[in-house]
Design a protein with these regions (language model features):
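Short edge beta-strands and adjacent turn/loop segments
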Residues: 36-39, 45-72, 116
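Short, charged, intrinsically disordered terminal tails
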Residues: 1, 115-133
Length: 133
């Protein structure tokens, strides 16, 4: 963005980080990224002193005055995916336009998985215990 007083350049990583944070704010988003991205993120989180990657699952294309965003998410089970996608779009567009002044031309959302609360529970049963005979 250029003015008579100088030029402001916003790095793609800044735009991606803002989009990632705005996506996480929406109720119904369990995680960002596909399974491989989340696996790498989980490994990074275990390294002492490693910083959280707020742009995980987000890719952007940034021009002089416009930006396009792609977001990969895991939705919580029971949430309307259409409503969730609409909420993500609204929040990402509002955050980016307010914070950067860029016009957001599109926010594409890919839902890679649905999170079930039971996926994290470990009640001690084995797969043999869960078989129907």
């Amino acid at each position: 963005m250029s003015t008579e007083r100088g030029k402001t350049t916003i790095a793609d990583t800044v735009v991606a980080k803002i989009a990632g944070l705005a996506t996480r704010e929406v109720a119904g988003v369990h995680a960002l990224g596909g399974s491989a991205t989340r696996a790498v993120g989980a490994l990074r989180d275990r390294i002492p002193g490693a910083s959280v990657n707020h742009a995980q699952g987000v890719s952007v294309e940034v021009g002089e005055k416009q930006a396009a965003v792609d977001v990969d998410i895991v939705a919580e089970y029971g949430v309307s995916i259409n409503d969730l996608a609409g909420g993500i779009r609204r929040n990402v567009i509002a955050a980016l336009e307010r914070m950067t002044g860029l016009e957001v031309v599109e926010v594409n959302i890919t839902v890679h998985d649905v999170y079930l609360a039971d996926d994290d529970s470990d009640d001690g049963r084995t797969s043999d215990d869960l078989r129907v005979v």
